[in-house]
Amino acid sequence: MADTAPQLKRKREQEAEEAETPSTEEKEAGVGNGTSAPVRLPFSGFRVQKVLRESARDKIIFLHGKVNEDSGDTHGEDAVVILEKTPFQVEHVAQLLTGNPELKLQFSNDIYSTYNLFPPRHLSDIKTTVVYPASEKHLQKYMRQDLRLIRETGDDYRSLTLPYLESQSLSIQWVYNILDKKAEADRIVFENPDPSDGFVLIPDLKWNQQQLDDLYLIAICHRRGIRSLRDLTPEHLPLLRNILREGQEAILKRYQVTGDRLRVYLHYLPSYYHLHVHFTALGFEAPGSGVERAHLLAEVIENLECDPKHYQRRTLTFALRTDDPLLQLLQKAQQP
């Protein structure tokens, strides 16, 4: 999917910190809606400083670069650019082999041969996600780091995690831009406008919307002040039920994918602290869908029906990077 700089403002995340692909939290490149008109990157020049992370499996690379060095600022500005090979589109793949495709032989033995095939321009796009200007937090976020599992009690959350989160400058203005139709209004698949129990459903930027195998949408609630799973009580059950039922119905209507082919879940810890729910194709191993982070929405609803304070009391397990100050806070508090 060829996103403009305004659209790219929306990964994440996502993504999940353990994720190898960007998600709806890549929002830092501007505000606005997409266009098919030719566009330019929101900066001039790009001098690679460091490869932050790469994955041959996922065919993705994260680059830190200096930009705008010719604008009078001798030091330039920091930017992160994420390059990702896009999935094949089944309806177009035959075009790669018709006519006289440009090929370079790599290997041949009996009936087996391997080539490098150089596709035409319209079939060789690379998804490019831009984070600009990028802060030190962004550079650390995209750098590969070791992870550790930690168990957080309800008391840990109230005394350590919540104060730590409140001390951080975690802007979610991009979320409000979507909810207020200031950005990406044309990408909204479905909306329940109720200010308390409504939400918008929008494709995650990790999904190019060209095939259903990696379908990925996000439901973002209109109601403000619900940070995460830990805040949920029976008061929020109407909202959660609406997201589950209406989200599945909207996806069935738009994409002909039934609810039993969807994984519908919340992250804990989330990538950003405004309640949102992930809808992914069941066969897609989406970043952050592992047992240490994903909580199925249907089970969240049932837990709240059985115990109104379930998520205030329950011990939750999740992964943190080894350089995350929150990990050190929790580990120190849990030392015997």
From Swiss-Prot:
PANTHER family: HISTIDINE TRIAD HIT PROTEIN MEMBER, M7GPPPX DIPHOSPHATASE. A motif (nuclear localization signal (NLS)) lies at residues 9-12. A motif (nuclear export sequence (NES)) lies at residues 141-153. The gene is Dcps. Its main location: cytoplasm. Decapping scavenger enzyme that catalyzes the cleavage of a residual cap structure following the degradation of mRNAs by the 3'->5' exosome-mediated mRNA decay pathway. Hydrolyzes cap analog structures like 7-methylguanosine nucleoside triphosphate (m7GpppG) with up to 10 nucleotide substrates (small capped oligoribonucleotides) and specifically releases 5'-phosphorylated RNA fragments and 7-methylguanosine monophosphate (m7GMP). Cleaves cap analog structures like tri-methyl guanosine nucleoside triphosphate (m3(2,2,7)GpppG) with very poor efficiency. It catalyses: a 5'-end (N(7)-methyl 5'-triphosphoguanosine)-ribonucleoside in mRNA + H2O = N(7)-methyl-GMP + a 5'-end diphospho-ribonucleoside in mRNA + 2 H(+). It comes from the Eukaryota. GO terms for cellular component: cytoplasm; nucleus; P-body. Its EC number is 3.6.1.59. InterPro entries: DcpS/DCS2, Histidine_triad_CS, HIT-like_sf, Scavenger_mRNA_decap_enz_N. Keywords: Acetylation, Cytoplasm, Hydrolase, mRNA processing, mRNA splicing, Nucleus, Phosphoprotein. The hydrolytic product 7-methylguanosine diphosphate (m7GDP) efficiently inhibits the decapping scavenger activity and acts as a competitive inhibitor in vitro. Inhibited by 2,4-diaminoquinazoline. GO terms for molecular function: 5'-(N(7)-methyl 5'-triphosphoguanosine)-[mRNA] diphosphatase activity; identical protein binding; RNA 7-methylguanosine cap binding. GO terms for biological process: deadenylation-dependent decapping of nuclear-transcribed mRNA; mRNA cis splicing, via spliceosome; mRNA methylguanosine-cap decapping. It is found in: Cytoplasm; Nucleus. The C-terminal histidine triad (HIT) motif and the N-terminal domain are required for the decapping activity. The N-terminus is necessary but not sufficient for binding cap structures. The modification Phosphoserine is found at S23. Homodimer. Associates with components of the exosome multienzyme ribonuclease complex, such as EXOSC3 and EXOSC4. Interacts with NDOR1. It comes from Rattus norvegicus (Rat). Belongs to the HIT family. The modification N-acetylalanine is found at A2. This is m7GpppX diphosphatase. Substrate binds at residues 174, 184, 204, 206, 267-278. Residues 1-36 are annotated as: Disordered.
